[in-house]
Amino acid sequence: MPSVKAIENNELKELLEQYKISFFSMEYFENDLIRNFDNNISLNDDNIDDIRKNVIGKNVILIAAGPSLENELVSLKAVLESNERQNICVICVGKISRKLLENKIKPDYIAVTDAKDSTRWQISGIEDCGIPLLYLSTAASNVVSSYTGKRYIAYQNGFEKAEKMAEIKKNTLFDTGGSVA
């Protein structure tokens, strides 16, 4: 989108670039998204709305992968071993869930969003760790179905089948922003 680069308004430019990423991602992965959605819906998992009571009023720590994670493990562990633990909800992305568990850090939830089957490695070996899995309705169904613990599905805006299902079931729709994080 060379013409977008000419736009001086940074907010508008960023909005258009995010739209482009979202649009092309949905178009490129459309068949995977539909297959994953259909497979995931057939699991009849509870909806993520059911965990609201476990999160409301708490400080939420979302742990994602990145270069600073290694430096923060000790601090994170200290916070989670403190008296404040009951006031904290920890959600981690699938990519680092095993690393946290290896470091004796137990998140409250593991979240997976990626539609690609190749992300199965993210939860390999921890499928029965006892931590509930939060997943987008279009997340890789091979990852979701292999997880033997409690699972909660989330429906996202921008995917028509998810929007319809959320409307039928009266569930919350989430804006995912076209990005994994």
Predicted regions and their residues:
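N-terminal donor/sugar-recognition subdomains of glycan-related enzymes
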Residues: M1-N87, R98-N103, P107, S118-I131, ...
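Short beta-strand segments
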Residues: L62-A64, L134-L136, A154
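Hydrophobic/aromatic beta-strand patches that form the interior of the parallel beta-sheet core
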Residues: I91, Y109-A111, L134, Y152
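Short, glycine/acidic-rich beta->alpha junctions
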Residues: I91-C92, D114-S118, G125, T172-V180
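Short, acidic/turn-prone active-site loops that include or flank metal/cofactor-
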Residues: G94-S97, V112-T119, L136-A140, Q156-E160
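Active-site/ligand-binding-proximal alpha/beta "capping" segment
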Residues: S141-A181
